Amino acid sequence: MTDTTIRARGAQAAGSPAGAGPLDAPDGAPRAACLELDGITVTFPGVRALDAVSLSVRAGEVHGLMGENGAGKSTLLKVLSGVNQPQAGTLRLNGLAQRFGSTRAALEAGIAIIYQELHLVPELTVAENLMLGQLPNRAGVLDERALVARATAELERLGERIDPNTPVKLLSIGQRQMIEIGKALMRDARVIAFDEPTSSLSARETERLFRIIHALRADGRAIIYVTHRMEEVDALCDRVTVFRDGRRIETFESVADLDRDRLIGCMVGRPIADVYGYRPREPGDVAIEAKGLRGPGLAEPVSFSARRGEIVGFFGLVGAGRSELMKLLYGAARPSAGHVELNGRRVSFASPRDAVRAGIALCPEDRKQEGIVAIASVADNLNLSARRHFSPARLLLDARRERELAARYIARLAIKTRDADTPIGALSGGNQQKVILARWLAERIDVFLMDEPTRGIDVGARAEIYNLFYELADAGRTVLIVSSDLAEVIGVSDRIVVMKQGRIAGCVAKAQASPDALIKLALPR
């Protein structure tokens, strides 16, 4: 098994006795810094991306990096990988000053970056990707037998049962990520940085990644872990450093004693209460009601209602049926029993288009795959639904109307984009989510179904999204929020429906909502 293999090698390399802490040397003293940054400054025209940043990472630790988008985390990784050259400051690796002119130079020195967008060649095989840059050859001819043998050995070390001759394009995201990790290990990288590695992984793939990272840590490697997710910091990190506006704000030396409110305050530059900014309101009549609804993912009939001006959270563990329920409400799946009522009238949707016409819209969990057309412009994405109102006979006028509509909502929702023609794929996750919301605002939607609306979005952008939800509720709209983030679902919801194994386990009023109460309802008996 991979983690056992890596741990065994790590114990031999580090010589650590039983009972030594992860950051301790064999004699119990703290391990020395493996990587040191001193006064690193990176500037671009008109922008100081990193401002005199100093940071140390120890061998045998997982060091978390947190901060909003634009805080400087990605620039720091690019300095480590040789993509960006600092204008000032020193980078030391094992006490020796280094300056990398290329990613190859950084990798040869022992630094590997596992980016969010994986850098593999889809058309090449697993073996070829693992060995890129060091393909075995005999007299200048590729030694395929040696290639496959070395790749097979590495896959076994990772615990991956993959045919090394498989083209990478046929692998899952989780499998591709393991190939990236394998590449780093084959080059004996002692510093490995992960950039938001779980953003596209399933729960099972995430669990497997965490086991690998724990094993790498036990092997004495220095791990840098960039994330937005507090639960990942709790599960993995020994220390965590917060960045804001290109500066290192603070390093928290013990995650076990971490003050979450203080950490989030460091990230956004204001108290945590301002992040959720909850404001109560008096709800109106029932807007949407499910009565005995059955369908894919639901083990028992589901019944609930939500009122105008109300924000209802849906919490549960993976497989609880929350996303499946949203798809039934949206017409993306057909119920096998029960029905939905909208404003007191029974409705039935043959497709999502029918739901939108009736006033129900969904912002999907997989924003990039189901919510946007990444290569299309912000304006095109914003107008995807509204175009059905425009007249084919008046194309020029309607093109003008589309641009006016896009400009209006870009301003109204403070969407950060160069202009309306910018490809939406170039925007941050928070701004992509705003474009999806703008699309439905242009449709005069009454019921908004939000499935994991802030996944992969930094804390500052989350606050803006939450404020949009409050504005919708203040205007009498109904917002249903599926969220796996306990603090979020408690912080923004008027009440919370807890689902478990395809059924509703209970409904909790805001005054009684606590992490313990929700978890107890969500856990299988």
UniProtKB/Swiss-Prot annotation:
Alphabetized InterPro entries for the sequence: AAA+_ATPase (IPR003593), ABC_carbohydrate_import_ATPase (IPR050107), ABC_transporter-like_ATP-bd (IPR003439), ABC_transporter-like_CS (IPR017871), P-loop_NTPase (IPR027417)
Natural source organism: Burkholderia thailandensis (strain ATCC 700388 / DSM 13276 / CCUG 48851 / CIP 106301 / E264)
Domain of life: Bacteria
Quaternary structure and interacting proteins, as annotated: The complex is composed of two ATP-binding proteins (AraG), two transmembrane proteins (AraH) and a solute-binding protein (AraF).
Start and end residues of each ABC transporter domain: 35-270, 281-524
Entry EC number(s): 7.5.2.12
Enzymatic reactions: L-arabinose(out) + ATP + H2O = L-arabinose(in) + ADP + phosphate + H(+)
Keywords linked to the UniProt accession: ATP-binding, Cell inner membrane, Cell membrane, Membrane, Nucleotide-binding, Repeat, Sugar transport, Translocase, Transport
Top-level enzyme category: translocase
Membrane topology: Peripheral membrane protein
Function summary: Part of the ABC transporter complex AraFGH involved in arabinose import. Responsible for energy coupling to the transport system.
Compartments in which it is found: Cell inner membrane
Protein name: Arabinose import ATP-binding protein AraG 2
Entry binding sites for ATP: G67, E68, N69, G70, A71, G72, K73, S74
Region entry Disordered, spans: 1-25
Predominant localisation class: membrane
Family of this protein: Belongs to the ABC transporter superfamily. Arabinose importer (TC 3.A.1.2.2) family.
Biased composition (Low complexity): 7-25
GO (cellular component) term, any one: plasma membrane
Cross-referenced SUPFAM superfamilies: P-loop containing nucleoside triphosphate hydrolases (SSF52540)
GO MF annotation: an example: ATP binding
A Pfam family that the UniProt record links to this protein: ABC_tran
